[in-house]
C-alpha cells in the first residue's frame, strides 16, 4: 500500500471553562487533524500544543505548514505500512517539530491497524490493561470551585485523583489553597500538584516539604525546564515524588534525567515527544532506570487521547495513572464515539486503529477558515 495523499486541517474547539495555568489561561484548544490516505483507506492523527506556542515551540499554524509543505512531499508514494521508514524520512526532512511528526505517525499507525483489523495497542505488542486510573485537573483558580468540583467527581465515581495547578498565585496563597483542599477531602482523594515551572529552587525547597506534609503525592515540574540540576537536588532532598514534564521532550533529555536521577517520574506526552515510537523509547529509559512513567496529556481531543491510551495500555507500569482529560474539558467532541470513565478509570477504546471515528461534520464546524 502506497501513501496517496496527506491532508491537515486546523480545528479550534472551545473548552467548557477556562483552564488556568501559571503560563497561560486556555479558553480553546487548537488541533491539527491529519489524514493519510492509501487505497481507499484513511488513517487519522492529531497534533497540538497546550495553549499554543507559550508551552512549546509549536502551534497549530506551524504544525499544519510542516505537515503539508515539508513532510507530505517526502512521504507521498512511499509504503504506508513502513512506519519506521516514514519516521526516518521525516527526521531527515525536518528538524524538531515533534507534534507535526507525531500527528503523521498517529495517522500511519491508525491506517495500518485498520488495514490489518487490529488495534494500535496490538500493533505495539498488545495491551497490558483495559483501563487506566485518571486524575482530574483542578485549575479554576478558586478554592471553593475546585473543592466543589472534586467532591462532585468523587461522588460520581469519575475521579479520586486530582492534579492542582499552582504557580499563578503567590506560593503562600498556593499553600493556603492546598491546605483547604487537603483538609476537606482527606483520605477520599489523592492530591498532586503541577507548578508549570513557576518557582525557583529556593521557593521550591521551602514549599515542597509543606506540600508533602499535606499529603501531596507528586510534584510536577516545580522549576524551569532547563534547571535539571535543581530538579535533582529537590528529588534528593524530598521524599515526595518529583516529576519532569517540560524538562522532558527527547530521548536525549530522558537519558540525561535518568543518568543523573534528577526526577522520580517521567510525564509521557506523544505530541511533545515526537509520537508513539519516540514515547515508547522514553518509557523504556524510565523502566530501565527505575523511574515511574505517567500518562500525560496535551489536552488532546478524543483522537489524540485514544492514541495515547493505546500506547499507555502497553507500558508495563503506570503507578500514578494518567491525566488524559482533554476530551472532558472540551465543549464538544471530534469523534462519533465517546471515551468512558468508570470507577475512576479511563477505559481503553476497543476496535480497530485507535478506536475512534472522526466526525466530519464536527471537523467542518470547527475548522479554521484561513
From Swiss-Prot:
The cofactors required by this protein are:
Mn(2+)
Q: What is its EC number?
A: 5.5.1.7
**Family statement:** Belongs to the mandelate racemase/muconate lactonizing enzyme family.
Q: Which amino acid positions bind Mn(2+), per UniProt?
A: 194, 220, 245
The protein's name in its UniProt record: Chloromuconate cycloisomerase
Reactions catalysed according to its record: 2-[(2R)-2-chloro-2,5-dihydro-5-oxofuryl]acetate = 3-chloro-cis,cis-muconate + H(+)
Query: What terms describe the molecular function in GO for this protein?
Result: chloromuconate cycloisomerase activity; manganese ion binding; muconate cycloisomerase activity
Keywords, alphabetical: Aromatic hydrocarbons catabolism, Isomerase, Manganese, Metal-binding, Plasmid
Q: What PROSITE patterns does this protein's entry cite? A: MR_MLE_1, MR_MLE_2
Can you name the source organism? Answer: Cupriavidus pinatubonensis (strain JMP 134 / LMG 1197)
A single Gene Ontology biological process assigned to it is:
amino acid catabolic process
- What positions constitute the catalytic site? 165 (proton acceptor), 323 (proton donor)
Amino acid at each position: 500500500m502506497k501513501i496517496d495523499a496527506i491532508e491537515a486541517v486546523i480545528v479550534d474547539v472551545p473548552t467548557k471553562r477556562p483552564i488556568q495555568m501559571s503560563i497561560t489561561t486556555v479558553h480553546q484548544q487548537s488541533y491539527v487533524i491529519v489524514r493519510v490516505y492509501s487505497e481507499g483507506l484513511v488513517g487519522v492523527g492529531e497534533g497540538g500544543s497546550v495553549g499554543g506556542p507559550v508551552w512549546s515551540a509549536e502551534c497549530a499554524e506551524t504544525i499544519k505548514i510542516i505537515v503539508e509543505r515539508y513532510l507530505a512531499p517526502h512521504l507521498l508514494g512511499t509504503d504506508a505500512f513502513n512506519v519506521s521508514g516514514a519516521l526516518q524520512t521525516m527526521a531527515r526532512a525536518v528538524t524538531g517539530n515533534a507534534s507535526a511528526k507525531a500527528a503523521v505517525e498517529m495517522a500511519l499507525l491508525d491506517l495500518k491497524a485498520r488495514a490489518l483489523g487490529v488495534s494500535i495497542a496490538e500493533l505495539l505488542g498488545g495491551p497490558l490493561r483495559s483501563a487506566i486510573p485518571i486524575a482530574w485537573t483542578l485549575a479554576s483558580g478558586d478554592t471553593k470551585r475546585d473543592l466543589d468540583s472534586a467532591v462532585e467527581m468523587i461522588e460520581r465515581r469519575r475521579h479520586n485523583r486530582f492534579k492542582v495547578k499552582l504557580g499563578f498565585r503567590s506560593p503562600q496563597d498556593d499553600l493556603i489553597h492546598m491546605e483547604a483542599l487537603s483538609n476537606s477531602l482527606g483520605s477520599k482523594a489523592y492530591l498532586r500538584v503541577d507548578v508549570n515551572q513557576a518557582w525557583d529552587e529556593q521557593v521550591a525547597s521551602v514549599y515542597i516539604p509543606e506540600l508533602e506534609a499535606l499529603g501531596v503525592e507528586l510534584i510536577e515540574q516545580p522549576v524551569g525546564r532547563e534547571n535539571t540540576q535543581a530538579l535533582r537536588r529537590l528529588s534528593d532532598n524530598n521524599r515526595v515524588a518529583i516529576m519532569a514534564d517540560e524538562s522532558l521532550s527527547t530521548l536525549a533529555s530522558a537519558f540525561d534525567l535518568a543518568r543523573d536521577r534528577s526526577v522520580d517520574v517521567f510525564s509521557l506526552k506523544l505530541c511533545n515527544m515526537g509520537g508513539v515510537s519516540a514515547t515508547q523509547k522514553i518509557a523504556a529509559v524510565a523502566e530501565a532506570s527505575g523511574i515511574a512513567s505517567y500518562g500525560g496529556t496535551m489536552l488532546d481531543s478524543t483522537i489524540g487521547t485514544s492514541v495515547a491510551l493505546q500506547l499507555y495500555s502497553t507500558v508495563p507500569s503506570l503507578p500514578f495513572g494518567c491525566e488524559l482529560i482533554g476530551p472532558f474539558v472540551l465543549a464538544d467532541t471530534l469523534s462519533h464515539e465517546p471515551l468512558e470513565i468508570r470507577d475512576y478509570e479511563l477505559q481503553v477504546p476497543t476496535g480497530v486503529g485507535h478506536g475512534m471515528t472522526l466526525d466530519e461534520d464536527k471537523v467542518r464546524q470547527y475548522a479554521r477558515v484561513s
